[in-house]
């Protein structure tokens, strides 16, 4: 039994001495490496916050205090220390432990997290609720430095700094250049300010001046003089200008110092920011050397520190990367834009070859889309490479700054559809619905990597106006070619309609139906806006029945538009719409999620059978 195995309560954690705490931190890192190696997940960021997480759990009672994680992928250590250690073997699996904070898992997860830069907003809301309800608990927002590239963080800090709420923001700085007060004198000043005696003297001085005539005015005058000379000699941090009391930087791997600083800021009665310096991947050499690779990783060999290469197949993101790189050589007006996802979207090759035409704007999706509009207005051809779940953050800019002017901006929408282990915060299941609501928007849905390359070239070089090309995470399925016509399989009993890579399940369903004596016609739509209603109508007139399968929520889905359009054309008959419904889909392997939603081949075949038996 390891020391970590004995930590089953906060009391047990708080009882450890310094040597035991060092041993515990080493044990947590070993536990993380071994478990994430089996399940995949976010490793480097969690290795970097081991000491910080341990200190937070010792200083704060997270069953009562509110500890909010920005983004949330650095919450593994928190989960280990709050009763979920034994569930780590199920991390990111269907029905298992989520890879992000989840209130349904534990009272110590006060809020869901998954997207960046929102933690201070949520924390301020909780702090204000605490004040209004006359309750007593601490509110802490833990924000990675990357989240500080998102404008929402500054909106919240601007508001929080003007408030009088007791609020603690911890900035986990593991690589961004965020400059605090610099120089030996400034560091000495910070050291003085973090000594308890400093505050005892300050409190005593205020008490004495309050008792003498004109003492309050004297205190205010001396305080202003002190602040004036401090600013003259040492300057101020950006955070202080926003109204936060700033502490730091602090070594994020010095547990004793961290606890001291956390107890200090815990006693402040106004907004405070603690700046902590950590090393991403700390304690595991492969992750220290390649923190980006180990940020989010599949299962790997913990001894070699690498993913198994056998059976490695090119992904849709790889195809996008190769295609946009080739297009960059062909057309000098092409610019590529990403919001802090250069490697994830596959733009790293384009950035290496055409650095002056590649823009990583940080976690600023709205800015990325508006800037793309500006580039397009001046004759460039911007390609915004973005995950589906993050594009929804820029919906207003897409409407106002691109579509309203009919500008030719190409959106390469990666991770469209169900993404697997990252779960409900990351599934790309809303873009079908909101993109199709945008006037003038064209939406293409390749079903294979070959189609992705073809459609991307067409979108960039031939089409006009705003265009979205949406494609999934992962590799090709059984369908790998390029469909010349929508009809992939002729039939006479029922029409099966789908788009994108779900065609693989639909084709498999058609084979299952054939074994049951049902002849299914299969249509694959290359575009979901505009829709080829004519082809669907012609097929349904022949078969008399229709099933539409799609990896999207039901409100505003393709199936509903098809149904309305067919009815308007006088085409009737039994119809079944198979989609994700009006709900959030949990984490798990995509095949398991297909079964959950009724989108796997067997479920689709059963649904089509019911339609043919007039039981729909």
Regions found by a protein language model. Give the residues of each.
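Glycine-/acidic-rich phosphate or pyrophosphate-binding loops and their flanking alpha/beta elements
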Residues: 260-263, 295-296, 315-330, 346-352, ...
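Non-catalytic terminal/interface segments that mediate subunit docking, oligomerization
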Residues: 66, 270, 278-392, 397-407, ...
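N-terminal amphipathic, basic-rich helices that act as targeting or association modules
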Residues: 1-82, 238-260, 268, 272-278
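Cofactor-binding active-site loop characterized by glycine-rich and histidine/acidic residues
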Residues: 42-163, 316, 333-334, 338-339, ...
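Peripheral docking tails and interdomain loops at the edges
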Residues: 299-303, 307-312, 420-422, 442, ...
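Active-site nucleophile and cofactor-binding loops and adjacent substrate-binding regions
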Residues: 41-49, 68-73, 101-120, 143-147, ...
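Long, well-ordered, tryptophan-enriched scaffold segments
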Residues: 175-320
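Structural signature of the thiamine diphosphate
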Residues: 218-286, 408-413, 433-481, 601-616
């Amino acid at each position: 039994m390891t020391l970590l195995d004995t930590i089953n309560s906060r009391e047990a954690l708080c009882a450890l001495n310094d040597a035991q705490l060092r041993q515990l931190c080493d044990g947590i890192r070993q536990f993380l490496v071994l478990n994430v190696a089996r399940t995949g997940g976010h490793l480097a960021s969690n290795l970097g916050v081991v000491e910080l997480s341990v200190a937070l759990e010792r200083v704060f009672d997270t069953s009562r205090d509110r500890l909010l994680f920005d983004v949330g992928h650095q919450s593994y250590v928190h989960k280990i220390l709050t009763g979920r250690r034994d569930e780590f073997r199920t991390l990111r699996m269907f029905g298992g432990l989520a890879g992000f904070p989840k209130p349904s898992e534990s009272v110590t997860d006060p809020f869901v997290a998954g997207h960046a830069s929102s933690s201070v907003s949520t924390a301020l809301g909780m702090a204000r609720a605490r004040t209004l309800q006359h309750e007593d608990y601490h509110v802490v927002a833990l924000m990675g430095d990357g989240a500080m590239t998102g404008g929402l963080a500054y909106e919240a800090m601007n508001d929080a700094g003007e408030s009088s709420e007791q609020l603690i923001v911890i900035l986990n700085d593991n690589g961004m250049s965020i400059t605090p007060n610099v120089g030996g004198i400034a560091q000495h000043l910070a050291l003085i300010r973090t000594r308890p005696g400093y505050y005892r003297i300050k409190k005593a001085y205020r008490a004495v001046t309050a008792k003498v005539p004109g003492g309050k005015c004297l205190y205010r005058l001396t305080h202003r003089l002190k602040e004036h000379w401090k600013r003259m000699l040492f300057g101020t941090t950006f955070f202080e200008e926003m109204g936060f009391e700033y502490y730091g930087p602090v070594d994020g791997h010095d547990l004793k110092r961290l606890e001291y600083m956390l107890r200090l800021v815990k006693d402040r009665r106004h907004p405070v920011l603690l700046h902590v310096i950590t090393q991403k991947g700390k304690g595991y050499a492969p992750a220290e050397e390649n923190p980006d690779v180990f940020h989010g990783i599949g299962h790997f060999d913990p001894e070699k520190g690498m993913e198994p290469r056998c059976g490695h197949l090119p992904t849709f993101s790889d195809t996008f990367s190769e295609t946009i790189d080739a297009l960059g050589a062909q057309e000098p007006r092409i610019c590529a834009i990403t919001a802090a996802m250069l490697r994830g979207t596959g733009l790293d090759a384009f950035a290496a070859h055409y650095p002056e035409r590649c823009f990583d704007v940080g976690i600023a999706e709205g800015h990325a889309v508006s800037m793309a509009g500006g580039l397009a207005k001046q004759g460039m051809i911007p390609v915004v490479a973005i995950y589906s779940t993050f594009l929804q953050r820029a919906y207003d800019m897409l409407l106002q700054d691109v579509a309203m002017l009919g500008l030719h901006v190409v959106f390469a929408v990666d991770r469209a559809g169900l993404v697997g282990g990252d779960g409900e915060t990351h599934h790309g299941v809303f873009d079908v619905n909101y993109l199709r609501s945008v006037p003038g928007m064209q939406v293409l849905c390749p079903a294979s990597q070959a189609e992705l390359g073809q459609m991307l070239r067409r979108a960039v070089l031939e089409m006009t106006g705003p265009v979205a090309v949406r494609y999934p995470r992962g590799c090709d399925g059984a369908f790998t070619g390029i469909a010349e016509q929508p009809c992939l399989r002729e039939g006479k009993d029922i029409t099966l309609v789908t788009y994108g890579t779900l065609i693989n399940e639909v084709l498999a369903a058609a084979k299952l139906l054939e074994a049951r004596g049902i002849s299914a016609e299969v249509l694959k739509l290359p575009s979901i806006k505009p829709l080829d209603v004519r082809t669907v109508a012609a097929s349904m007139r022949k078969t008399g029945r229709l099933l539409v399968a799609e990896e999207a929520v039901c409100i505003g889905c393709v199936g509903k538009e098809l149904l309305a359009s067919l009815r308007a054309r006088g085409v009737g008959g039994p119809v079944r719409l198979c989609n994700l419904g009006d709900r959030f889909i949990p984490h798990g392997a995509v095949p398991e999620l297909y079964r959950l939603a009724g989108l796997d081949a067997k479920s689709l075949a059963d649904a089509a059978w019911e339609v043919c038996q007039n039981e729909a």
